[in-house]
Design a protein with these regions (language model features):
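Surface-exposed extracellular loop regions of Gram-negative outer-membrane beta-barrel proteins
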Residues: 1-18
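Beta-sheet repeat architectures centered on beta-propellers
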Residues: 20-35, 41-192
């Protein structure tokens, strides 16, 4: 549906845009480049409010929808990774997930129109924003024991850039997870 300002007593008008498409779950849409990326009930598409276009071929589409756990399909969500021009379709897989949390992601790069896949460490949410991880860097000049000529360790520095956003994973148990750029889950690589 589209909402248009019309003024008067009703203020807004709602009109159906597409009669042949819907959304799989509440968090299955994200905006980018004046478009919306949508995981529908049987397709993955983008639209600009006027026209829609599928962005996944039939083979990969079948693999994606057959991989989503049927009991947890409503926990599927899309996470935007704007830094790398990506949209992540995150879901609980039918084979490996027994927690109901997202353990797989199909990743679409909207600049190259290429898809990739990755494993996730059972996350309930991925968010985009500025991540202050400066608390993990506690070395000070006074505490550094290395000699000036041989010491290459950092001290008293900001371990993040407050002007650059990144992805942050969250798990349902409440443990803080590191930035996605670090490929770490509580200090353990999840790529290994």
């Amino acid at each position: 549906y589209i909402m248009s300002h019309i003024g008067g007593a009703f203020i807004f008008d709602f009109s159906q845009i597409f009669s042949d498409a819907g959304i799989l779950a509440q968090r299955c849409v994200q905006a980018f480049d004046d478009k919306h990326f949508v995981v529908g009930t049987d397709d993955v598409y983008i639209h600009n409010g006027q026209t829609k276009q599928s962005v996944i071929d039939n083979v990969l589409k079948d693999e994606l929808f057959n991989s989503i756990h049927s009991s947890y399909y409503d926990r599927t969500f899309v996470a935007p990774n704007y830094k790398d021009n990506e949209m992540w379709v995150c879901f609980a897989s039918g084979v490996e997930s027994n927690t109901g949390q997202a353990d797989k992601a199909f990743v679409w790069n909207y600049r190259t129109n290429k898809w990739s896949k990755r494993d996730l460490p059972d996350v309930s949410h991925i968010s985009w924003g500025i991540v202050d991880d400066s608390g993990t860097y506690t070395s000070s000049y006074d505490a550094d024991s290395g000699s000036w000529d041989s010491d290459s360790t950092p001290w008293d520095f900001r371990g993040y850039n407050p002007t650059q956003s990144a992805l942050l994973l969250a798990e349902p148990t409440g443990n803080k997870l590191h930035k996605i750029d670090s490929y770490q889950n509580n200090g353990t690589s999840y790529l290994a």
